[in-house]
Regions:
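Short, flexible loop/turn elements at secondary-structure junctions
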Residues: 12, 85-87, 105, 127-129, ...
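Solvent-exposed edge beta-strands and adjacent loop segments
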Residues: 114-133
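Conserved small/polar residues in nucleotide/adenosyl-binding loops
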Residues: 183-185
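A broadly structural signal marking compact, well-ordered functional cores
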Residues: 105, 110-113, 134, 138-145
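Short, conserved helix/loop micro-motifs enriched in His/Cys and acidic residues
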Residues: 136-181
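Short, compositionally stereotyped local motifs that mark structural "simplifiers"
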Residues: 1-98, 103-119
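Long, contiguous hydrophobic alpha-helical segments, chiefly transmembrane helices and signal peptides
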Residues: 47, 81, 101, 125, ...
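Generic detection of long, well-ordered alpha-helical segments
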Residues: 91-94, 132, 173-177
Length: 185
């Protein structure tokens, strides 16, 4: 990705565009957009248009994932899920933390990061499981979020539409996944 310029536009000639880079909602005191924003690392940009009459547009978010050099050329025959918390540290066990998820599916039999993600959206993520939460392979609960951190339904990997999902890390129990029907589909 390198140094990628990102441009924000508005159809209104009198509008002031304000944006944030920390995931917060842009407000009247947020950074004023004056020209292309340079993206040099994984970033989330949230922007709103402020009109002189006091009206404010809905928030629009864009997320950019900077992959480590050792995985940029990775490919696989199965779908790949990438989650980035933008430097947020470890995934919490209590409240959902904002993150971004992209799902890549095979094209021509191979999944590659040069393919466009089939799903790319804001999420809330947390670890789950009281007795299993400290194990080497944890499970995660996640919710697909809209611009207001409200649940929104998606259908990842051809599954039914839903907002709440589990990334199940079966580690100590049923390591062979014999009781996990998804593995046998």
């Amino acid at each position: 990705m390198g140094n990628t310029p990102m441009t924000i536009t508005s159809e209104s000639p009198t509008a002031v565009i304000r944006y944030t880079r920390d995931g917060s909602l842009p407000g009247a005191n947020s950074t004023r957009y004056t020209g292309p924003v340079t993206i040099t690392s994984s970033s989330r940009i949230r922007a709103r248009v402020f009109e002189p009459d006091g009206s404010v547009s809905p928030t629009v978010s864009r997320s950019y994932i900077m992959l480590a050099s050792n995985v940029r050329n990775f490919s696989s025959t199965i779908p790949v899920v990438v989650i980035d918390s933008f430097g947020g540290g470890g995934v919490p066990s209590g409240s959902f933390e904002e993150a971004f998820m992209a799902i890549y599916e095979p094209v021509g039999g191979r999944t590659s990061f040069s393919n466009e993600a089939v799903l790319a959206n804001r999420i809330g993520i947390k670890t789950r499981g009281s007795s299993t939460g400290g194990r080497d392979k944890v499970s995660y609960g996640l919710e697909f979020w809209d611009e207001n951190n409200e649940d929104t339904d998606f259908s990842p990997l051809g599954m039914p539409e839903e907002s709440d999902w589990i990334l199940y890390g079966a580690y100590n129990f049923d390591r062979a996944h014999l009781r996990l029907s998804l593995i046998h589909i």
